Amino acid sequence: MKEPTKIDFQHRRISQISDFTELLGMLFPGNRNQRYAAACMFCELKWANGMVPNLAYLEDKYGISRRVLQRARAKLTRLGLIEHVSCLNSRYGGQHGWKLSSRFEAGLRQLAEKCSTSRDKTVGSEEKDKMLLGFVRASLDP
């Protein structure tokens, strides 16, 4: 039976995560090679002094193929767990390279806030919600 490749984002599973390897298992459920590459990147970026200019050295150090490394890096970047800083970014004083990012955390906080406000009956109105429901319904009709 083939394993799914989509992120396994279940509330019960989230409460059971105790370390970054389990987090990466949730983010890369169907590809052990990408999970390993992501774990290597995460560990290297976490314990690096400053930014890592290039992640290509991980290919030789950990025996990871370039394609797997690039795909894992792209997914971690899209999720906001890592980010590339340009040398033109004045915030980092001309430094450039890869670093761990807080965008994922900020996005999850915003999502939690949106879920909380959408449940609150004091925010918005029933008429507006029914109108929005009508828009969703209209998008279903061909």
Regions found by a protein language model. Give the residues of each.
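Short, cationic-aromatic polyanion-contact patches
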Residues: 32-35, 87-113
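Short, amphipathic alpha-helical interaction segments positioned at domain boundaries
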Residues: 102-134
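DNA major-groove recognition helix of helix-turn-helix
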Residues: 73
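A short alpha-helical element within helix-turn-helix/winged-helix DNA-binding domains
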Residues: 51-65, 76
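C-terminal regulatory/oligomerization modules of transcriptional regulators
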Residues: 1, 137-142
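Key DNA-contact positions within bacterial/archaeal DNA-binding proteins
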Residues: 67-70
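A short, conserved structural fragment
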Residues: 77-89
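Short recognition helix of helix-turn-helix/winged-helix DNA-binding domains
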Residues: 1-53
